[in-house]
Amino acid sequence: MSSKPLNYLTIGKTGQHELIIKKSKFICSLARTETVEEAQEFIEQISKKYHDATHNTYAYTLGLNDNQVKASDNGEPSGTAGIPELKALQLMKLKNVTAVVTRYFGSIKLGAGGLISAYSNSVTEAAQNIGVVKCVMQQLIKFSIPYTRIDEI
């Protein structure tokens, strides 16, 4: 028997959600991605869009068994941005999702705990606002039989 899940949770569509925490603006952009190339393309797209931001951090989880995961703090103190974003995706059991959180610094330092909370909450709230959907794995099976044998089915 296969160990692959028969269904999984992901986001319903690409979208964004914004939080303001102690004058810092956090914009979380989420996209459904199935390959590293798709994830990197989305990260680059958001980073270009918000090129003037203080940070564009990211995390992604790809594959139904989290086969490929990656996180980046993009200049924030180590472990305060990308990993909390990744953990938020994993706690919500989301698969094939890339999160990019853009931060515009608001002149008040948040400290390590504040950053961890802000980045994690950005992803969680974005997913809740954008919408989580359940994907059910299906396989289409086609077969043909002679009309004279239709009663045998």
Describe the function of each predicted region.
Residues 16-21, 129-134, 153:
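Short, flexible, solvent-exposed loop/turn segments with mixed acidic/basic and small polar residues
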Residues 35-36, 146-150:
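Helix N-cap motif at beta-to-alpha junctions
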Residues 24, 53, 93-95, 135-137:
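Short flexible coil/turn linkers enriched for glycine and charged/polar residues
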Residues 133-147:
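Short glycine-/aliphatic-rich beta-strand segments at the starts of folded cytosolic domains
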Residues 1-79:
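C-terminal regulatory domains involved in ligand/effector binding and gene-expression control
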Residues 39-42, 119, 153:
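Hydrophobic side chains in well-ordered alpha-helices
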Residues 81-129:
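Active-site beta-strand/loop microenvironment that shapes enzyme catalytic pockets
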